[in-house]
A protein has these predicted regions:
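Short, charged/polar micro-motifs that form catalytic or ligand-binding hotspots
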Residues: 1-2, 23-34, 122-134
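Hydrophobic/aromatic-lined pockets within catalytic cores
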Residues: 12-20, 41, 45, 49, ...
Length: 180
């Protein structure tokens, strides 16, 4: 069963470093993993339309309308890391873009009903694709490499390897859908 600690230990193993039992233990490696895992995970999540992270919801109108320009405001879901598509639910509107803007954690538009397709901030690694888990572990290893090894050449090499793993994971993920 996958866990954040397992993913961190995969990163530490890549570096030849001591593994951890928990993110809160009082070791340098645990502190680094605890500090860097979530930002790395979210950066990787935002970098691609990962199939395992896509959510679709109808947004509820906010009670307060925008001050100018648009008629309606909607609050983005708490875990929304990236908006992929906004539509009004009719078949042809899914293929055409509606006029809207993202302002902070709000969507403003003139549409009275909207649906959101977005990248969700899923925290359970068991819900990640295996390639995504591996890509995150490699990105984490590259990120913490210098702090653990004090070797900039090795850190640069790991960044190259991590980027290769990320490209591979994106390719595998992108080819799972039917052709448009």
């Amino acid at each position: 069963m996958a866990s954040v600690v397992n993913m961190c230990n995969s990163a530490l193993n890549l570096l030849g470093a001591s593994t951890i039992s928990s993110l809160t233990e009082d070791t340098k490696n645990a502190r680094l993993c605890n500090q860097r895992f979530e930002p790395i995970r979210d950066r990787v999540f935002r970098s691609h339309n990962w199939n395992c992270l896509i959510k679709r919801v109808q947004l509820a109108q906010d009670s307060t309308a925008p001050v100018v320009e648009f008629s309606y405001a909607y609050t983005l879901p708490v875990g929304c890391l990236r908006v992929l598509k906004i539509h009004n639910g009719s078949t042809d509107s899914i293929k055409s873009d509606l006029e809207y803007k993202i302002e902070g954690r709000k969507v403003v538009t003139d549409q009275s009903t909207i649906y959101l397709v977005y990248i969700d901030q899923i925290t359970d690694p068991n819900e990640f694709d295996s390639y995504l888990r591996e890509a995150i572990s490699h990105q984490l290893a590259a990120d913490i490499c210098y702090a653990i090894t004090n070797n900039s050449t090795l850190a640069n090499n790991y960044m190259t390897r991590a980027d290769e793993r990320l490209r591979e994971a994106r390719f595998i993920d992108a080819t799972e859908n039917s052709l448009d």
